[in-house]
Amino acid sequence: ERFRDADRRGQKDDAGAPTASDERSYGVFDLVALRHACAVNSADGIAITRLDTLAGLDTIRVCVAYENDGGSIVTVPESLAELEGYRAVTKSLDGWSESLGESRRYEELPGALHDFLGFVEDVTETPVEVISASPENRIVRRKIWTG
């Protein structure tokens, strides 16, 4: 399933770039796959970019498990072929309407975005260290690169 963003046609995003003249389509944010990627790569931090594209959505749906008629799983199987016949189990999180264009500190971000990022951290067991709305607008919560 996808979210549609037809009412933003002709507008500019937080980076100042024109939005597509077509409908923008958003898939479900798959936290099961992200948790797996963090685990197999021994990630100690996550960077989430283009959060400006989610501003204005009433809800943001995230995948927290996969299910079929035989039950549900919360991990990525060894072979993706094993997911045949499964469907995403989703949870709806509150969206936010505020633009992220002027935010320079984590504390300035909308409360619903704080909740979203906290949920991502809880499910993946990995902190979100970098938050970005555009190349010029990023918030680094903990400096993870040195040198």
Residue spans for each PLM region:
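Non-transmembrane, aqueous-exposed alpha-helical and coiled segments at domain scale
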Residues: E1-G147
